[in-house]
């Protein structure tokens, strides 16, 4: 169909400014009102096209574009030649990449990465490359059945793939490796900060047990910062596959050991501090309660539990950052889990044999909070 005056330019063309009719004359609306209306439209269009931003990240990391750009200023034509991509389309991709704050155009057709863009490289300590890759993989596919989760309160992932996420992961070693790498990337900087004594005094505990500790990054940081502490990484055989190597690489292998199992049935006994970092948000209230009861049964009377999670406010207001709420739905759709408020966690702990003793949100750990509890 040939474009008409009504359709030419597509749906993103800004709507005409509202007009007011007075005494037979047409006058433009107040500039402030127009700006507000245009701002609202711009926000909605940005949200509608949010998937394009995700696709840009997906393609950039699949092409290893950030690695190719490295620390140098690069010409779009040069990058296109290296990638075997169309030079004009590559320039357009790079300009969108820059508009998202991941690069800057330093001259006509020349680009370099911003600090955020550098985190998409694979060769930097605080890389988020694997996090992007796993987020744009099987996790994304479940969103085609988002309505199932909202209608039923159950994870759409199970409906799409016929099994739950962690069972699906356990049968696919390559995907499991990507998932573990993504969690390591997301945890690395936070683990180093948490291990510092001013954030939490791990030095007062003889043995720290990291439940669901994956590749051991958190425990390695804790043991490195506190030479008098010993520790245990506990996870499934797949999850803990690289933990011993991580502890050895950090020079703490003699003080840290790895145990494998299912935290729904048992966890190592005899610890002084049990840590659950970003574990409970993977699970429903009922399954989280099962985990907490298992931990409670293993804990000596003097031991403490440290839960590390993002806490949502009891009610959302205009100052609330959307990431926590996006993560909440992400957990629902893919795992059946949820982000919780402080009130939610206190209630969950109380129902499973714990007394909350302290809740802190240290500035250096934002957006995470530390919830300490004692067995009762």
UniProtKB/Swiss-Prot annotation:
Top class in the EC scheme: transferase
Sample GO molecular function, one term: O-methyltransferase activity
Signal peptide feature range: none
Chain intervals with Basic and acidic residues compositional bias: 19-28
Keyword NAD found: no
Binding site residues for S-adenosyl-L-methionine: 235, 261-263
Keyword set, alphabetical order: Methyltransferase, S-adenosyl-L-methionine, Transferase
EC number per UniProt: 2.1.1.38
Record-linked PROSITE patterns: SAM_OMT_II
One record GO biological process: methylation
Active site: 281 (proton acceptor)
UniProt entry tagged with the keyword Calcium: no
Reactions the enzyme catalyzes: O-demethylpuromycin + S-adenosyl-L-methionine = puromycin + S-adenosyl-L-homocysteine + H(+)
Region (Disordered): 1-28
Family the UniProt entry places it in: Belongs to the class I-like SAM-binding methyltransferase superfamily. Cation-independent O-methyltransferase family.
Protein name: O-demethylpuromycin-O-methyltransferase
Source organism of this protein record: Streptomyces alboniger
Gene label: dmpM
């Amino acid at each position: 169909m040939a474009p008409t005056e009504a359709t030419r330019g597509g749906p993103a063309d800004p709507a005409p400014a509202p007009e007011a009719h007075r005494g037979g004359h047409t006058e433009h609306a107040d500039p402030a009102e127009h700006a507000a209306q245009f701002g609202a439209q711009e926000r909605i269009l940005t949200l509608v096209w949010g998937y394009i931003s995700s696709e840009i990240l997906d393609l950039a990391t699949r092409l290893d574009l950030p690695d190719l750009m490295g620390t140098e200023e690069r010409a779009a034509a040069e990058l296109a030649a290296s990638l075997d991509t169309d030079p004009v389309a590559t320039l357009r991709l790079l300009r969108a990449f820059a508009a998202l704050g991941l690069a800057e155009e330093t001259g006509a057709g020349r680009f370099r990465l911003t600090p955020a863009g550098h985190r998409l490289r694979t060769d930097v300590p605080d890389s988020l490359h694997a996090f992007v890759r796993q987020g744009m993989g099987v996790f994304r596919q479940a969103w085609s059945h988002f309505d199932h989760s909202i209608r039923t309160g159950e994870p759409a992932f199970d409906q799409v793939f016929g099994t739950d996420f962690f069972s699906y992961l356990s049968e696919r070693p390559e995907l499991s490796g990507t998932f573990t790498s993504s969690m390591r990337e997301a945890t690395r900087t936070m683990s180093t900060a948490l291990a510092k004594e001013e954030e939490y005094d791990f030095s007062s505990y003889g043995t720290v047990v990291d439940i669901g500790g994956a590749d051991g990054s958190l425990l390695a940081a804790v043991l490195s910062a506190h030479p008098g502490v010993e520790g245990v990484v506990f996870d499934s055989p797949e999850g803990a596959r690289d933990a011993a190597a991580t502890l050895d690489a950090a020079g703490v292998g003699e003080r840290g050991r790895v145990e494998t199992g299912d935290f729904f049935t048992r966890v190592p006994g005899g610890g002084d501090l049990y840590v659950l970092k970003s574990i409970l948000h993977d699970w429903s209230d009922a399954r989280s309660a099962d985990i907490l009861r298992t931990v409670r049964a293993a804990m000596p009377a003097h031991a403490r539990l440290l839960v590390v999670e993002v806490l949502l406010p009891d009610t959302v207001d205009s100052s609330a950052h959307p990431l926590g709420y996006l993560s909440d739905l992400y957990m629902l759709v893919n795992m059946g889990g949820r982000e919780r408020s402080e009130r939610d966690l206190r209630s969950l702990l109380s129902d499973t044999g714990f007394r909350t003793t302290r809740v802190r949100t240290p500035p250096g750990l934002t957006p995470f909070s530390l919830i300490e509890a004692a067995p009762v």
